[in-house]
Amino acid sequence: NYKCIDYEVGIDRSTVMSWNLIAESSPSIMYMLVGDDAEFITKNWDQIFLDQYKKYPDGIFMIGTATGKQHGLIHKTSPHPVITKEWRNALGYFWPVQFHHWCLDNYTNDLATRINRYIFLEDVMIKVKKITEDNTAKRIRTDAVNKRDQWVYEKTKQCYFEYDVAKLIKACSK
């Protein structure tokens, strides 16, 4: 019962802008930050995701999964977080609009952890092969880009984090 989602190849813009535009046009109830290089290893991963609504019927939660990297399992990091439509509606965005590409997963993880709504599914494996040799990969992985996005992350945490936490907590109590 899934509807195909149209996509557009167009002007050069931040990936975050593109992801938000896609989410805003989609009737989906969950959104995942992941590219076309992902390999979904675990069978029925989609149903496992949907089953998390039983834990939080208000829909305010974030899902993280195993990626095949030991660091991620130890620290329960989620470079490919999954959020819900309710989460997006509460915050007003899919991913924080001020980010260009990197660090928005950290910010989202921080929010979910802060409100105690981070579900880490270590038995669900989604492996991603990082493509690092093409022109786009080289352009977005420079030291300057990393410093820019780290600065945006720190400023966003400083200026907006408590506000975003309050919006999510308010949505939890509805």
Q: Where do the PLM segments sit?
A:
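Active-site nucleotide-sugar/metal-binding loop of Leloir-type enzymes
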Residues: 19-30
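A short, conserved beta-strand element in the Rossmann-like catalytic core
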Residues: 38-41, 107
